[in-house]
């Protein structure tokens, strides 16, 4: 998106198709608060930047690029495994955008694949029964963009409730500025932050 007005139009288009603010935030790689802010047209009144949009379409349009990113993610996982002396049984992809990366990491590391779908309205999400189970597994959680960390926190909580242990979160881009969530280390390929402003 080239401008905030275009971002607003896209958010409004998705809202008119019946998507929730949470679903729109996932689609546009924005925080829920930013989507709410956009849809309220507050951006017309305010001059300050409220969020940073992370667009990774150039990576996602070709499987070869997803594999390249997955190789970097796999390398980070191996580095953390060696540094912190832990093993990994499974790779978990958070729907929708974490799944392609998790699938490739699972393949590259020869680990089971778990698919998790957060529910847009409830606190608990669910694990797809078409993929590996969680119980008794040491799990790396993979997603594309972490804005507030809420989805990752919910995933960690649900993994724990199902008898698994989240040992690491690896994300493409982080807006959070934290190194761990709920005691689980977080590593990202890119970190963003706003410097200065009002």
Curated annotation (Swiss-Prot):
It comes from the Archaea. This is Transcriptional regulator GfcR. One of its GO terms (molecular function) is orotate phosphoribosyltransferase activity. Keywords: DNA-binding, Transcription, Transcription regulation. One of its GO terms (biological process) is regulation of gene expression. It comes from Thermoplasma volcanium (strain ATCC 51530 / DSM 4299 / JCM 9571 / NBRC 15438 / GSS1). Belongs to the purine/pyrimidine phosphoribosyltransferase family. GfcR subfamily. Contains an N-terminal DNA-binding winged helix-turn-helix domain and a C-terminal regulatory domain (or effector binding domain) resembling phosphoribosyltransferase (PRT) domain. The gene is gfcR. SUPFAM superfamilies: PRTase-like. InterPro entries: GfcR-like, PRibTrfase_dom, PRTase-like.
């Amino acid at each position: 998106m080239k401008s905030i007005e275009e971002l607003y139009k896209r958010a409004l288009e998705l809202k008119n198709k019946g998507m929730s603010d949470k679903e729109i935030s996932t689609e546009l790689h924005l925080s829920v608060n930013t989507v709410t802010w956009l849809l309220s047209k507050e951006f017309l009144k305010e001059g300050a930047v409220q969020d940073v949009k992370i667009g990774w379409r150039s990576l996602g349009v070709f499987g070869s690029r997803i594999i390249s990113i997955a190789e970097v993610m796999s390398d980070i996982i191996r580095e953390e495994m060696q540094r912190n002396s832990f093993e990994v049984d499974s790779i978990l992809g958070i729907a929708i955008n974490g799944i392609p990366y998790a699938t490739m990491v699972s393949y590259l590391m020869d680990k089971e694949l778990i698919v998790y779908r957060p529910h847009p309205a409830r606190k608990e999400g669910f694990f797809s029964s078409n993929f590996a189970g969680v119980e008794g597994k040491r799990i790396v959680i993979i997603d594309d963009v972490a804005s507030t960390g809420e989805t990752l926190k919910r995933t960690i909580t649900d993994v724990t409730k199902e008898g698994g242990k989240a040992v690491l979160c690896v994300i493409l881009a982080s807006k959070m500025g934290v190194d761990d969530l709920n005691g689980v280390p977080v590593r990202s390929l890119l970190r963003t932050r706003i410097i200065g402003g009002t």
